[in-house]
Design a protein with these regions (language model features):
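An alpha-helical, amphipathic repeat domain used for nucleic-acid recognition
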Residues: 1-197
């Protein structure tokens, strides 16, 4: 039966290296060491070692995800993609479900905050919808987020901002606003009201 021969500290203060039969086996959190009651001389079956390694992998992925969420709010899909890039694809779903249970991941809250931020930047509803869709947000949640956007006000503000120092070229302004995701039918009345040539 395999025997724990050494537990050494890592650079990360809450983690240790586990050595089994004088060979490095995996890194563990101090919580795992305590819950498994590991010490030098502990005997473990191969099945227990496999479970321990699997738990360690989930724990490491969870800690990475928590740090990632500390940078800014993210959607579930963004966290899954991040863990995939960090080579934790096999445990990404388990980690995301845990983060949701613990309240760290809420796609509805993310979508509301993200769309509000984009509205302040005068994004069109279509551009916000496309971005939230790419971030894995459901259509129902997206529809709730963009329902109250005042497209006309955003277009008028963009026209005013763009024409502050110069006369408005109607065609250029039209291309600019269409490029920002606004529809022709929303842009035309605003341009007519602005008196552009």
């Amino acid at each position: 039966m395999p025997v724990v021969t050494k537990l050494t500290s890592q650079k990360q203060k809450d983690f240790v290296n586990l050595y089994v039969d004088d060979e490095f086996y995996c890194g563990l959190s101090l919580n795992q060491v305590a819950s498994w009651r590991l010490h030098k001389g502990s005997e473990l079956t191969h099945d227990q070692l496999d479970r321990l390694r699997s738990e360690a992998r989930v724990s490491k992925a969870y800690n990475l995800a928590i740090r990632y969420l500390g940078l800014r709010i993210h959607s579930s899909q963004e966290v899954i993609e991040y863990l995939r890039r960090k080579e934790f694809e096999d445990v990404s779903i388990v980690v995301v479900e845990r983060l949701k249970r613990e309240g760290y991941l809420q796609d509805e809250n993310f979508a509301l905050r993200w769309s509000a931020m984009r509205q302040q930047m005068l994004w069109s509803p279509r551009a916000i919808q496309d971005e939230l869709s790419r971030k894995g947000i459901s259509k129902d949640v997206i529809d709730d987020c963009i329902r109250g956007i005042d497209t006309r006000e955003a277009i008028i503000e963009l026209i005013a901002k763009k024409s502050r120092n110069q006369a408005i070229d109607r065609e250029k302004m039209m291309r600019y606003l269409v490029g920002r995701g606004f529809s022709y039918s929303d842009i035309k009345p605003c341009l007519d009201d602005s008196g552009s040539k």
